[in-house]
Amino acid sequence: MKRLLSLAVIASLLFSPLAQAAPKKISVKPLQLLTSVGTPDEVSGVVASGSSLIVFGSKASKAYARAVDTTGKELWNLSLDQSAVSIATAAAVDQAGDIWIAGATPLALGLIAPTPSPTPLNPDNAAVPPATIGNLQAITIWKISATGVLAFTNTLPTSSVVLPTAIAVDRNGASIVGITGNEKGSAGFLANADKAGTFGTLVQIGSASTTADSVVRHTDGSFTVVGSSSETLSGKKVAGITDGVIIKISKGLKITNVVRSSAVKGKRVWNSSSSTLLLGGEVIVGKKIESAITKFSSSYAPTWTYRFPSTGPTRTAGSTYAAFISTGVSPLLNWNPKSPTPLLLSFDAKGALTGAASGPVGQKEVLGALISKELGVLVVTSSAAAVSIFTLIPR
C-alpha cells in the first residue's frame, strides 16, 4: 500500500504542469527617446537636477555645463574655466539639486606641483590620459546651483596628468576618483573635498596599472572604490590578465580591503557602482565579451550576479537597474538583437530579473543610467553623431 501511495505521489509531481512549467521569458519593451543633447566629442555625460537635464563636457577645449528641459530647450549655459584647456568629465547632484562637476585644469602659473605622498595600492593596465591634455595636472571641482550659478571652483594640484572618471556627493562633501599618469604607466586616485569644496589629501591607488572608475561614500566616512588592476594590490595578486577590483578605504584614508574579480586568461573591469553596491562591469576572454552585473553586500560578498553578451561597459543605477549595449540572446529574455543594441534591465531586491527595455540600433556606448524622482529612469547613450537620452515613460 505504501509503495502504491509513493508511486501515486511521484506521478502527481511528474505530471503537474504548474510544478514543471518553465519560467516565462521577459518581454523587451522599447525605450522612448526623450531628447538629444550634443555630439560625443563635446558631451561627457548627463545628470538630472529636478526636472532639468544637466549636460557637461568640453567644447573647443573648454569645460562647460548647461541645462536643458526634456524637449532639449536650453535653460542656461555656463563656461566653467578660462584656461587654454580644461575638461569636465564626471558629475553628481546633491539632495538640494546643486550640481558638482569634476574635471581637470592646468596648474596655476608659477605653481610647483607637490610630490605626492600616496597610499600605495597596486594598479591595472589603465591608459595614460592622452598627450593633448598633457598639462592638465590639477584635479578640479565646480559646484553649480540648479539655476546655473557657479558657487565655487577649487583645485588640487598634482605632479602628473589626471583624468577624473567619477564623483559621488553627500551632505558632507564630495569624492572624486580617476586615473593619473606616471613614468611607470598609470594609477588610480581618490580625492575628497568637504562641503565647501576644499580638498584633503590625495590617495594614490597603485603605481603602474590601476584604474579607479567609480566611488561610493559611506555614512561611516569610509569609501568604496571600484575599477581594475593588473598588479598586486595590498598583497592580493592578479588572477587573470586584468582583474576587476573593489577597494575599501577607511575614513583615515587607509586601504583596508581589496577584493578581486577575475577571469582565467581574461580581463575584468568594474565600470560603475551605485550607492547600494550594485556593480556593473565587463568581462573579456578571447573574443567573448560580456557584461557582469553583481549585487554585493557591505562586506563585498556577492549576493547575486548575471552575465549577458555585450560590447562590455555596464552602468548601474540604484539597487535595481543596469544598462549596456547588448550583442546576443539571453535565455531569460525574448530577445535576439541582430546588431548591438542598448538594453536596460531591472531586478527586484532578491536579484530576479523583472523587466527589460531596449533603445534603437546605432548606439555605440551607454554613458549612464539615472534614476530621477521627476523624470523617472533615464538611459544616456552615444552614437557616432549624437548623445541621446531615453526614458521608460512613453511621451
Predicted features and spans:
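Polar low-complexity intrinsically disordered regions
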Residues: 1, 15-21
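A sequence-level/structural motif corresponding to short, flexible coil/turn segments enriched
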Residues: 21-395
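Bacterial N-terminal signal peptides
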Residues: 8-16
